[in-house]
């Protein structure tokens, strides 16, 4: 039997980021930053989540001798178009303080190719419909994360993290041609997400936290559709904003 939706959490705490946003963050995070992954089909009540959970525990390294380490990486994929990504990570580890800065860029360009050939019979007449749909989608996403962990005393910890994903000028264009209609549909917009997480744990067992996510995606859609008997044109502005 299936487990339904799976919730991803970080360090045992739910996030106001969506699963897709968390997955995007983890895709761009060095493997060396992850201590372990815990899979639970029925999460305990302390996680405040129903159903299956994947708890990703990030490393919390401290060292008597302070040191700095870094990591860079790239990935290239060739399909119809070239796609690629790159990341750089810089970490500082000390006796009581550890800090981590991550930046990555991910460029994607995808082809859209969908042809429709159908035959419709109305009475004794067969109508042949052929539509050829082509287009592309592209976007360059900038992912950033800055995290700080400070050990105030042996059992007092303060964790702070800022995460963002920004895609300026995300664009999708589709065109359709055939014996039924001629159409063009384009959508453009600037997408951004920002998340702030603060967590404090005291030696008395007190835990206080703040998790806030801001998401904004204003977009413009330009649509034209022409048939033998009609013509449709519209220009629409839309905006999606989330504060939670």
Predicted stretch roles:
Residues 1-18:
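Extracytoplasmic beta-strand/coil segments of soluble accessory domains associated
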Residues 15-43:
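Short acidic/polar hinge/loop motifs at secondary-structure boundaries
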Residues 22-24, 49-73, 84-86:
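N-terminal periplasmic accessory domains that precede
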Residues 51, 112-125, 171-179, 219-229:
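Outer-membrane beta-barrel translocator domains and adjoining extracellular loop/strand segments
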Residues 73-87, 127-143, 181-193, 235-242:
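Outer-membrane beta-barrel proteins
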Residues 74-80, 94, 105-109, 164-168, ...:
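Transmembrane beta-strands of outer-membrane beta-barrel pores
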Residues 97, 141-169, 184-244:
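Face-selective signature of the C-terminal outer-membrane beta-barrel domain
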Residues 99-140:
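Surface-exposed beta-strand-turn/loop segments characteristic
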């Amino acid at each position: 039997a299936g487990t339904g939706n799976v919730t991803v959490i970080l360090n045992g705490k739910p996030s106001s980021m969506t699963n897709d946003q968390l997955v995007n963050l983890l895709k761009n995070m060095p493997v060396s930053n992850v201590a372990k992954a815990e899979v639970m089909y029925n999460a305990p009540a302390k996680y405040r989540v129903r159903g299956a959970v994947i708890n990703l525990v990030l490393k919390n390294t401290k060292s008597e001798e302070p040191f700095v380490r870094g990591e860079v990486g790239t990935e290239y994929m060739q399909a119809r178009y070239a796609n690629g990504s790159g990341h750089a990570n810089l970490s500082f580890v000390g006796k009581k303080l550890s800090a981590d800065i991550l930046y990555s860029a991910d460029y994607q360009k995808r082809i859209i190719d969908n042809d429709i050939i159908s035959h419709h019979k109305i009475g004794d007449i067969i109508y042949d419909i052929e539509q050829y749909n082509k287009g592309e989608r592209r976007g360059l996403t900038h992912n950033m994360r800055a995290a700080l962990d400070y050990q105030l005393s042996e059992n007092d910890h303060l964790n702070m993290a800022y995460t963002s994903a920004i895609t300026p000028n995300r664009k999708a264009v589709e065109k359709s041609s055939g014996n039924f209609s001629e159409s063009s549909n384009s959508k453009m917009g600037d997408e951004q997400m920002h998340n702030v997480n603060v967590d404090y744990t005291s030696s008395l067992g007190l835990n206080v936290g703040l998790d806030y996510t801001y998401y904004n995606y204003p977009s413009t859609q330009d649509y034209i559709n022409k048939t033998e008997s009609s013509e449709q044109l519209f220009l629409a502005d839309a905006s999606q904003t989330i504060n939670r």
